[in-house]
Amino acid sequence: MKQVKCECGHINPVGTVLCESCGRALQETQPPLADMRYDGSARRSQTYNKTIIDKIWNFFSSVKVGIWLIVITLAASAFGTIFPQEAYLPPGAQADTYYKEQYGTFGQLYYLLGFHHLYGSWWYLLLIASIGISLVICSLDRVIPLYRALKNQGVRRSPAFLRRQRLFSETVTVLNGESKEKIVTLLKKKHYRIREKEGSILAEKGRFSRWGPYVNHIGLIIFLIGAMLRFVPGMYVDETLWVREGETAAIPGTDGKYYLKNNQFSVETYNSKTEKKVFADAIDRVGDGRVAKNFQTDAVLYKREGKIVYGEKPKLEKVTEEDIRVNQPLRFDSFSVYQVDYKENQLDQMVFQLIDKKTKKSFGSLKINLLDPDSVYDLGNGYKVEIASYLPDFYFNQDGEPSTKTKIPNNPAFVFNIITPDKPKGEKSFVAIQETIEGSGNNKYKLKFDHVETKNITGLTVRKDLTLWVLAVGGAIFMIGVIQGMYWQHRRIWLHSQDGAVMVAGHTNKNWFGLKKDLAFILADSGLTEPVDQKELIKTQK
């Protein structure tokens, strides 16, 4: 790497604007006031632009690029909230049909473009990663040169450097020891750190505030890492689990390791007669028994024993038995199971009677499990019923053909083949709720609806989040950086004696009014001229 040697003897990296030691300008053309944003240090992005690595570095080191990446990500995030994400669709809803049916052509386009799964899409994660890369490169491009410049800054600065500071004054006098000691005492009273060399003074305080933005960036980077970790398998789970009374289901996100049994689901509602009068009027408006007071699942948690053998019923070991209520989840092994919803009196089984249409004679009954129906029901004596087709949530599609919306038995329909001794080939019959269509139009036998059996279903949310501590650490570091950079300022005051004159200069990264007050306090009764704001002078001259 090339280097530039200053007249003072200090060796600076190529691209340095102001000597790190004495502050002398190293470039021919300079503005009236010194650019102290990074203390004139050499930034890689402003120096090299030859290789592909240089170009990538320069692209991501641009603050404008970082801002545009954030704006694009925010716009995409907002677009993802126009319609519900796929994870929040109603249970059993199919994304490929739901968006079009609910939101029309725009909904279909929303689905086709992949916005229904936006926050887990590769391009959205790429945007998040790009913001992280931009933060890292922006920080490294600035913090390393700034640290080097502040570390190497000399006490005795070039007169040209001091004259180009925003606050500057020059007094033709000799600073005696008593006046100098008084100034040093006042500087220490204002909590400045003092360094002296050859009659010159450098007073500095609040340097740590210069690192505030970079601490801020570190917090943001950690926060973004935490957000992206949510897409790593096993780090984050947010799934819905519906379990009918008396049934056991595998808990999603546990890889078949844990199972939950719904022993019983119960609902308690508000009653105007038993509640206080202040609530009774509101309950009467809504209706007695319509507002849930408490709903809970009497659950049993099981753990699978041994390895998973597909097709084999798992051996389960009881872990615990608890009641799951709203805001009182079941917790185990980093998982939490919350009570969030329920459905009462849901279809579970349908019972039919096989009868002769003319004589009404019954040849037996069959009970169909609507979640897992058998293919054949043998009634004995040569009578049996085959289920040729089963549509749990029956409707007619756009082509006018029978189809099913979901796998949930909201509106079950069947195509039966009724086999009897006198009809060995069977008679086809389409049976739905309050609707029967016979295949030949003149069947001898029919399946007469007898009754239904219902069950309550509990709606649970399974959550696991191992990224919360990462997000919390990132957020805490971010806030520390905000406070560090917002409530403190990096102030520097130089006093330089040379050739019968005393030069006073001051610089701060913000709050110039505060620095002016410090200078007025320190230089009072010292005989030195108070520095003037050269930036204001330049404005008035224009």
UniProtKB/Swiss-Prot annotation:
**Gene Ontology terms: cellular component:** plasma membrane
GO BP annotation list: cytochrome complex assembly
Bilayer topology: Multi-pass membrane protein
* Disulphide-bonded residues: none
| Primary location class | membrane
Null mutant phenotype reads: Cells lacking this gene exhibit a lack of cytochromes c but normal contents of cytochrome a and b. Can sporulate.
Q: Where is this protein localized, as stated in its record?
A: Cell membrane
Q: Name one Pfam family in it.
A: ResB
Domain of life, per UniProt, equals Bacteria
Bilayer-spanning residue ranges: 63-83, 118-138, 217-237, 468-488
Keywords attached to this entry: Cell membrane, Cytochrome c-type biogenesis, Membrane, Transmembrane, Transmembrane helix
Give a short account of what the protein does: Required for the biogenesis of c-type cytochromes.
What's the protein name?
A: Cytochrome c biogenesis protein ResB
Q: From which organism does this entry originate? A: Bacillus subtilis (strain 168)
